[in-house]
């Protein structure tokens, strides 16, 4: 019996010592993974808000499959339209037809804008609809930096997407004409300067389109309302007015997208109150100004709410 009591005392003493040791010396924390150093989060927290927002938005855009498919479908429509319209011009245009390098990318200017509107409005407002925007503010409580980061990345991707559409449209158009024994050489630019000018036109349209989309998305804060307003403005409001009518010529000259596409579409000079260079500047000032105003008002509203 004494042996049993001695063994139980030894066991209880051993357990008591182990408990005391564990309380005095707590368990060591697990080492961080080599691919994620311990100072990474601290370094990210000390970065400027805009830089953190740019990194976060880029991570989202890279894995936005739905946005990629929207741009892909837009590119397919633009390329198909460019090739089809160029073939029709060369076949049935007769002697009056004057094909050029612009005709080979006509689909980009006809349809890319609408695809970008859908892509922009969806990307900007899906977080508002799902409530993810409020969750994002917990890690980066700077709504102004988030909106600016979105605007920057959308502009860069829009320019790159439209450039790719233009290259594909030119390649498919020339290839389809060559396969049907049509004079494809008439759709080739006369010089590198002509293609450089087209690249500048595409950049201007992309920048203005994104800025206008950002402004409307912020002002409406609703996906269906934003898309309705964007398409109504371009297709109905700007589509209804004609610069040939002297009674509406002043109003026609004030339409932003009519000014933005003026250099490409090359309408009569008398339709506008100023020259094409002023039209380009007017288009960029109006669209970028609207986007900047929308972001500034959104920031002030958020400050009042706080």
Regions found by a protein language model. Name each.
Residues 4, 10, 14-37, 282-306:
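Junction motif at the cytosolic side of a transmembrane helix
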Residues 28-73:
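Aromatic- and glycine-rich beta-strand/loop motifs that create alpha-glucan
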Residues 38-46, 67, 71-123, 147-220, ...:
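Secretory targeting signals
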Residues 60, 125, 136-138, 213, ...:
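Helix-capping/transition residues at the boundaries of transmembrane alpha-helices
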Residues 66, 142-144, 222-226:
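Membrane-helix interface segments
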Residues 71, 134, 147, 227-228:
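Hydrophobic/aromatic positions within or immediately flanking transmembrane alpha-helices
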Residues 120-139, 144:
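Transmembrane helix boundary and interhelical loop/hinge segments in multi-pass membrane proteins
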Residues 220-255:
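Transmembrane helix segments
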């Amino acid at each position: 019996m004494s042996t049993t009591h001695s063994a139980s005392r030894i066991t209880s003493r051993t357990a008591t010592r182990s408990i005391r040791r564990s309380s005095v010396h707590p368990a060591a924390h697990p080492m961080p993974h080599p691919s994620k150093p311990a100072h990474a989060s601290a370094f990210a927290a000390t970065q400027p808000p805009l830089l953190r927002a740019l990194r976060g938005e880029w991570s989202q855009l890279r894995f936005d499959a739905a946005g990629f498919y929207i741009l892909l479908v837009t590119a397919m429509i633009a390329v198909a339209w460019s090739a089809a319209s160029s073939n029709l011009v060369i076949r049935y245009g007769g002697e009056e037809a004057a094909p050029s390098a612009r005709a080979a990318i006509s689909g980009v200017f006809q349809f890319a804008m609408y695809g970008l509107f859908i892509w922009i409005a969806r990307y900007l407002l899906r977080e508002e609809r799902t409530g993810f925007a409020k969750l994002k503010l917990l890690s980066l409580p700077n709504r102004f930096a988030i909106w600016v980061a979105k605007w920057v990345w959308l502009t860069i991707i829009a320019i790159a997407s439209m450039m790719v559409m233009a290259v594909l449209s030119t390649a498919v158009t020339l290839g389809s004409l060559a396969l049907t024994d049509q004079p494809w050489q008439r759709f080739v630019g006369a010089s590198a300067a002509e293609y450089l000018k087209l690249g500048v036109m595409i950049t201007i349209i992309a920048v203005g389109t994104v800025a206008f989309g950002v402004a409307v998305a912020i002002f409406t804060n609703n996906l269906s309302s934003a898309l309705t307003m964007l398409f109504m403005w371009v297709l109905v409001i700007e589509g209804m007015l004609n610069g040939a009518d002297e009674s509406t010529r002043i109003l026609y000259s004030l339409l932003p997208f009519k000014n933005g596409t003026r250099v490409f579409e090359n309408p009569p000079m008398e339709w506008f109150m100023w020259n094409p260079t002023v039209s380009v500047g007017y288009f960029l000032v109006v669209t970028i100004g609207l986007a900047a105003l929308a972001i500034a008002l959104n920031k002030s509203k958020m400050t009042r709410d706080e």
